Amino acid sequence: MELPEGSLVTQPAPAGFVVRKATMADLGGLISLFTDAGEMSRSPAALERPLRDRRVWLASMNGEVVAAALTNAETETLGMIGGVYTAPKWRGRGLSQAVCSAISEELISLGKQPTLYWQNEAAGHVYRKLGFRQIGIWRSVRLALR
């Protein structure tokens, strides 16, 4: 999906939550968030890399990291958003929308078009509400090494 120019529907942080750009000091909280994320799980190194070289946005409640979005790759003109995850007990409050909105705003301010792909309909619904539109189908194949 891509976010056409001028189509972002911004989503503020829900009441009681803080949405902000993450720093290296947030690594522990991000590791805790993604530890039990199933197929969304990420190693500490996979979280440290975007903190250092790209961008990560998070939502927190009383200092606890409860949702996040990051860029998996960036070029001069594009930013591939991924790692969008909300802890199960905090779902349904608009947190994924809020962190995706924030990271998209930052990418746009840098002259980069936000892009992403999704694997479940709930995620697709969130992205469409923000203004993203389908531009094709992404296929991913994993091969086992012997």
Each language-model region and where it sits:
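Conserved active-site alpha-helix within GNAT-family acetyltransferase domains
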Residues: Q97, N120-I137, A144
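Short alpha-helical
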Residues: A25, E76, E121-A122
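A conserved beta-strand-loop-helix scaffold within acyl/acetyltransferase catalytic domains
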Residues: R42-Y85
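Acyl-donor-binding surface of acyltransferase catalytic domains
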Residues: M1-A15, R139-L143
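Conserved acetyl-CoA-binding loop-helix of GNAT-fold acetyltransferases
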Residues: G82-P88, G92-S109, G124-K129
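Conserved GNAT acetyl-CoA-binding A-motif
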Residues: L107-Q119
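A short beta-loop-alpha structural element at the N-terminal edge
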Residues: V18-L30
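Helix-loop element at the rim of GNAT/NAT acetyltransferase active sites that forms part
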Residues: A22, S32-R42
